[in-house]
A protein has these predicted regions:
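Short beta-strand-to-turn element immediately C-terminal to the catalytic PLP-Schiff-base lysine
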Residues: 43-44, 58-63, 103
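Residue-level recognition of the GNAT/N-acetyltransferase active site
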Residues: 46-48, 214
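Glycine-enriched alpha-helix->loop->beta-strand junction motifs that scaffold or abut catalytic
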Residues: 37-39, 166-167
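Glycine-rich phosphate-binding loop of ATP-grasp-fold ATP-dependent ligases
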Residues: 50, 54-59
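PLP-dependent aminotransferase class I/II
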Residues: 2, 7, 11, 19, ...
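Conserved catalytic cysteine-centered active-site region
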Residues: 33
Length: 236
């Protein structure tokens, strides 16, 4: 991707919204934290993220001084000088209270991510023979499991079964981008719709299910989730 971006004179932007602390194996000898690979990277501090604030927030990181200055301009009305907008900008500063909270929570991020990986490994083990497909991670990469997402061709029935057992799940995300009303004008003409369908995207949207996973999740609770899935698998 970096070579492609360079060839076309484009910036490579990493979407790290759900990947705080994850690592990418660049080669057999080099692994890098996500957020250090592209020209810019964007992190979300929404409260449910691995590193979350008390409200909305986010961060852009870059090693490029020119881009850093541009982002600083955009975050506060395009100001270089107070009350003078050199470029169209926004009010998107992270307030000091949110920043202070994030600094405290940052100390615990590695431990929380380690706990998430332990819980995910237990799910992997317990669900190996169940009716779901578990996440895969390329060798050498380090996942942080903001979500633990399985796939099932009986997703809706499985979700209903888990709900009946008092187990909350979620679907991330039920409507693919290309089917969102905001982007209908990009859709192909009716005569070409079937040929231009994003079949794998639509299949994934119909199958994905996020199971409970967070650092404070107890092993006993996780085992109960896995047992309920095994019970469902035995019934179909």
């Amino acid at each position: 991707l970096r070579a492609l971006a360079k060839r076309h004179g484009a910036w490579l932007i990493e979407d790290c919204a759900q990947a705080h602390g994850a690592r990418f194996l660049q080669s057999s000898e080099i692994d890098r934290p996500v957020g250090t690979i592209g020209d810019l990277a964007c992190f979300s501090f929404y409260p449910t993220k691995n590193l979350g604030a008390a409200g909305d927030g986010g961060m852009v990181v870059t090693h490029n001084a020119e881009l850093a200055e541009r982002v600083r301009l955009l975050r506060q009305y395009g100001w270089r000088e107070r009350y003078i907008s050199d470029v169209p900008g926004l009010n998107s500063r992270l307030d000091e209270l949110q920043a202070a909270l994030l600094r405290v929570k940052l100390r615990h991020l590695d431990d929380w991510n380690h706990r998430r990986r332990m819980l995910a490994a237990r799910y992997d083990e317990l669900l190996a023979d169940a009716c779901v497909t578990t996440p895969t991670v390329a060798p050498g990469n380090e996942h942080v499991y903001h979500l633990y997402v399985v796939r099932s061709q009986q997703r809706d029935a499985l979700q209903a079964h888990l709900a009946a057992h008092g187990i909350a799940t979620a679907i991330h995300y039920p409507v693919p981008v290309h089917q969102q009303p905001a982007y209908r004008h990009f859709a192909p003409p009716p005569t070409h719709q079937e040929a231009n369908r994003l079949i794998e995207t639509e299949r994934a949207a119909a199958e994905v299910l996020s199971l409970p996973l967070y650092p404070q999740l107890s092993t006993e609770h996780l085992d109960r989730v896995a047992a309920a899935i095994a019970q469902f698998a035995a019934s179909i």
